[in-house]
């Protein structure tokens, strides 16, 4: 998972720039995470449980999408929604969403992309202190931060707004 602190910072940055944020989810753990991310933010909305067609309808009206390497990013690409896709242990060359206005941000972690289902990386004491290893794992996702994503997302939003 991309670190929750990064998601929160990105959401706050988007809202500060007058871009409301909608948070979809697919299972109970994702719903709980979305609620934590939206807590206290008036312009961050956790969507209700939606079937795939409902998620597609939400995406079709979006100015842009940010997703980890999941079906959400591929669905956004299929709908021609500008998308930033985040890659940690996976390789965008193998599984990246393709199409116009699709941007892949991949980790530069020394062992990424490892393509492993289970991370074998041994975090340092400093990493253990800095990150919540229950939520911010694998650590390769920590190498792409919210500022980097916003730097690439903002032009897509500006283009969509023009």
Where are these regions (language model features)?
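Donor-binding and catalytic core of enzymes assembling or modifying cell-surface/extracellular glycoconjugates
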Residues: 4-93
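Nucleotide-sugar donor-binding patch of glycosyltransferase catalytic domains
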Residues: 38, 46-48, 77-161
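A short, basic/aromatic alpha-helical/loop segment that forms part
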Residues: 1
């Amino acid at each position: 998972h991309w670190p929750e602190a990064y998601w929160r910072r990105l959401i706050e940055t988007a809202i500060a720039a007058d871009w409301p944020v909608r948070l979809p989810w697919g299972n109970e753990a994702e719903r709980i995470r979305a609620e934590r991310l939206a807590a206290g933010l008036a312009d961050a909305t956790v969507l209700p449980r939606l079937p795939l067609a409902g998620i597609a309808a939400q995406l079709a009206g979006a100015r842009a999408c940010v997703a980890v390497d999941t079906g959400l990013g591929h669905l956004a690409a299929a709908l021609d929604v500008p998308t930033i896709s985040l890659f940690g242990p996976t390789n965008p060359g193998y599984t990246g969403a393709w199409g116009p206005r699709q941007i892949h941000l991949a980790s530069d972690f020394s062992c990424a992309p490892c393509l492993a289902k289970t991370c074998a990386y041994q975090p340092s004491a400093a990493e253990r202190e800095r990150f919540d290893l229950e939520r911010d794992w694998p650590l390769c996702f920590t190498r792409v931060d919210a500022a980097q994503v916003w730097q690439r997302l903002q032009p897509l939003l500006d283009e969509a707004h023009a």
